[in-house]
Amino acid sequence: VLITTKMGQRGKTVITANLSAGMQQVAHQIPMLNTAGWVERQIAIRNYNHVYLNGERRPGRDESDPNSARALGNKIPNEYKDPSLLHDINWQDEVYRNVPMTNYQLSASGGTGSMRFYISGNYINQEALNIGKGYKKYSLRGNIDADITNKIKVGFRIAPSYSINNVGASAGLTYYGGLNVALVTLPPIYPAYNPDGTFATRADMPLTYDDGTSPSILNFTNPAAMSALYKSQMKRFNTLGTFFTTVELARNLVFKTSISADVNNVVTDHHVPSTINIAGANRYATSFFSTNIGWTNENTVTYENTFNDKHRLNVLAGFTEQKGQFQSLSVRVNDLPNDLVETVNAGTLASRTASKTEWTMASLIGRVNYVFDDKYYVTATLRRDGSSKFGSDSRWGTFPSAAIAWRVSQEGFMNSVQAISELKIRASYGLVGNDQIGRYAAIGAVAASNAILGTGDGQQLNGLM
């Protein structure tokens, strides 16, 4: 894999600006019943359930029976008999919208005789299809290369970014599941808004029976309110930085050392007001904070040479080390005093968790590439890795590999085959491994137990032993 980095050229500074903009919309909405069709279906279902049991008609029952003779679930509200008294909406239209997305980029590059630079800034604003949600990102990038002498070069890369992501409601906030499920399962008979512009709730959509009772509307959570009022915001600040130095030790022999850091800070806040929470008055909020820091140090020596215009040799040996540190804190509170207060200090503590971990890894690496006449390739690699995630008796692993290749398209007999421009046959064998286990999986955890201490009946002590 060849990774290239944008870099300025010697000469005058070049400034480049790019702007892209577009619109997003739902490609295809799911067709839904209108109120008249939905009510007709509901009446048919309730009449059937009232009259039939397991496919058999119940004696003495008829579709014309009044509500007073029906079970609660089979009663027919007065409003169903005249659908014009009900609302007629498509919940997808109430939540989905056509939204813009923009991307701004500005960069400058240039250099002098011994220094080159590239600096850029980027701003992305992408509103979500559902109301109240969207994504913004601000990022910078700086690349600098400098020649200290004709044998020593240094370079610096830095890429900070800050993003704000307001995401949609997750599953479990309604009887129908998440937001997108609710949009295609909630009946069209309920309003999204009251006449004064506020979001409609259960209390704003009374239904009545002709026997003087009213059904309890338990299974309603306004999707428009859920999309607009449910808050789940993630703020992420990330910085990638690398500093490297290359030194030409001798002809065709180069030493390179680099140190890189990846710092990632995340703050996530959730707030669920009573208007969209099934639990009603149980308003709740959560806050999550985390810091993830990764360090990498690489040191390599490379020898590269060509002999007699046909033999190419590349030999690399090196040592690398990595370290990762992670720390997090999560807090949830219930019973916030009202829907305007969103901070966790104002509620009743429901749960809290904290975590702090770290890991290290060290590697010895080696590679030999040999090419003859640009036709025949031989590669051999060897690496030995040690990870702190494993126990002391199995911490290190050795992973060799080898490959041979024949670039057939470079042979003379392929000159007449115009249909093939590049053909290479390659065979390889190697061993690979990973350390994707828990950071402390190799260490036995301390557990709680009971113990009897003393003479006679003794004394029972609870706790860690």
Which positions does each model-derived feature cover?
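A beta-strand signature from Gram-negative outer-membrane beta-barrel systems
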Residues: 1-16, 101-103, 116, 122-124
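Surface-exposed loop/interface segments of Gram-negative outer-membrane beta-barrel transport/assembly proteins
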Residues: 9-88, 128-133, 139, 143-238, ...
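Transmembrane beta-strand segments that form the barrel wall of outer-membrane beta-barrel proteins
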Residues: 19, 121-127, 378-387
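Outer-membrane beta-barrel initiation region
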Residues: 94-98, 108-112
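Membrane-embedded beta-strands of outer-membrane beta-barrel proteins
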Residues: 106, 142, 241-243, 299-301, ...
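A generic beta-sheet turn/junction motif
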Residues: 110-114, 123, 372
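Solvent-exposed loop/turn segments connecting transmembrane beta-strands
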Residues: 129-131, 388-393
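Alpha-helical support elements that line or immediately flank enzyme active sites
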Residues: 241-248, 259-261
